[in-house]
Curated annotation (Swiss-Prot):
Keyword Plastid among record annotations: no
Protein name according to UniProt: Putative integrase/recombinase y4rA
Keywords: DNA integration, DNA recombination, DNA-binding, Plasmid, Transposable element, Viral genome integration, Virus entry into host cell
Active site: 260, 284, 354, 357, 380, 389 (o-(3'-phospho-dna)-tyrosine intermediate)
Highest taxon listed in the record's lineage: Bacteria
Species for this entry: Sinorhizobium fredii (strain NBRC 101917 / NGR234)
Family: Belongs to the 'phage' integrase family.
Annotated ranges, domain Core-binding (CB): 112-197
GO biological process: DNA integration; DNA recombination; establishment of integrated proviral latency; symbiont entry into host cell; viral genome integration into host DNA
Single Gene Ontology MF annotation: DNA binding
All residue ranges annotated as the Tyr recombinase domain in the record: 220-402
Matching InterPro entries: CB, DNA_brk_join_enz, Integrase-like_cat_sf, Integrase_catalytic, Integrase_recombinase_N, Integrase_SAM-like_N, Tyrosine_recombinase_XerCD
């Protein structure tokens, strides 16, 4: 008896095993992410075979993990094909999204001395401190580098740590880093040393020995792309293609609204009020509502009407390759900008997306806008953040200078 997965294909028999009840939802999940009929069918067949194998091995749904997927590929009679491994990864990701199986925990069965300490610290951050996954990802390599710097491949005795070890490591580590990364290093190191003292591995407060990274927030001038280069870049995009239509709208939003890349990629359909001509932005400090310039609105509408794939996602801008969904993070837009700059041959001061934000602020300053007005558009919470743009236009600054007492008028 055939088992119809959807209107387009069926399995030769009903699936069996712990994953059987998830076969149809898994197929729908794949279709929603833009996978074609052939790819969806192949992945569903792989999932059904995996489920049968799990049943034969007596493995329950809640016990499934990545190791089982690897064993199944080795046990199969059929020769592994390109895409088999990816199909099982997608299935496990889907099952985790349904809370059917636990999140995968990477286990090193023969960890080094350094790695044992890193893993214990990671468990502390996750279980005792309940820190976010991204924070743990940021802290782990710092601790690994610090322990390797001090102890190498030898035995680790945290009781031997001295303040000089801490300062030497920080000085060598942060000399090559920008301000943001340097602060992550010092914060992670303080966290680890506080943890070590809490455990009794060290008795001194070595966290206090971690140097403070100076924060000269106004020490550098923002590197802004010029207005002519923005026009040239936008003109170079082929808006007759779906990808070009999307890229044009996204880059125009960067340039005309001064949005952060994360704010562009997280825009949702409900954030745009077409009648009032307003757009809601999810900024660093909550939501901010801005007027929607006509050219930006027209570009977004053109993309939605002509080029956006049909998809259940509420994100405005979607990826062009499967899985079809919103961008996972701002790096996708950064790649679009870098490719566009390279294609056009524009020698911009930087290759990132923030140059458009700086460019808008500089143009507003030259046009007579106050720092308060610029900060409101950019979503700055404090005027000190916006004050850095006052260094950009010396001619504008000269008009603000007061005459010295007694100076000839």
């Amino acid at each position: 008896m055939k088992y119809f997965v959807n209107a387009d294909f069926a399995l030769s028999r009903p699936p069996e095993g712990p994953v059987a009840i998830y076969i149809i939802p898994f197929a729908e999940w794949l279709v929603d992410r833009g996978y074609g009929l052939v790819s969806t069918r192949n992945q569903v067949l792989m999932a059904a075979g995996f489920s049968s194998w799990l049943r034969q091995k007596g493995i329950g749904l809640s016990d499934i993990n990545g190791e089982h997927a690897g064993r199944y590929l080795l046990d199969r009679v059929q020769r592994p094909k390109l895409g088999d491994d990816a199909a099982l990864r997608h299935l496990l990701a889907f099952l985790r999204s349904q809370n059917a199986i636990a999140e995968e925990i990477e286990v090193d069965h023969n960890p080094s001395a350094v790695e044992q300490h890193v893993q214990a610290y990671e468990r502390h951050l996750r279980d005792a401190r309940a820190l976010s996954r991204q924070t743990i990802i940021n802290y782990r390599p710092v601790v690994r580098d610090f322990l390797s710097f001090r102890f190498g491949d030898g035995e680790i005795s945290l009781a031997q740590l001295r303040a000089a070890d801490v300062t030497d490591f920080v000085q060598k580590k942060v000399s090559r880093l920008n301000m943001r990364r340097a602060k992550i290093v010092t914060t992670a190191l303080r966290s680890f040393l506080s943890y070590a003292r809490y455990r009794g591995d060290i008795t001194s407060d070595l966290a206090a020995a971690v140097p403070i990274v100076a924060n000269w927030s106004l020490s550098s001038i923002p590197r802004a792309i010029g207005r002519d280069d923005v026009s040239r870049l936008l003109s170079s995009i082929d808006r007759d293609t779906p990808i070009g239509c999307r890229d044009y709208a996204m880059i125009l939003a960067l340039a005309r609204l001064g949005l952060r890349s994360s704010e562009v990629v997280t825009l949702e359909l409900d954030d745009i009020d077409w009648v009032a001509g307003r757009i809601r932005v999810r900024g660093k400090h909550g939501r901010n509502e801005l007027p929607l310039p006509a050219d930006v609105g027209e570009a977004i509408a053109d993309y939605l009407w002509r080029a956006r794939p049909r998809n259940a996602s509420r994100r405005v801008f979607l990826r062009d390759k499967a899985p079809i969904r919103g961008f996972v993070g701002p790096s996708g837009l950064g790649s679009i900008v870098r490719r566009s700059l390279k294609r056009t041959g524009i020698d911009s001061p930087t290759k990132g997306t923030h140059q458009f934000r700086h460019g808008l602020a500089s143009e507003m300053l030259r046009g007579g806008a106050s720092l308060g007005e610029i900060g409101e558009v950019l979503g700055h919470r404090h005027v000190q953040t916006t004050a850095i743009y006052a260094k950009v236009d010396l001619d504008a600054l000269r008009t603000l200078a007061l005459p010295w007492p007694g100076e000839a008028q």
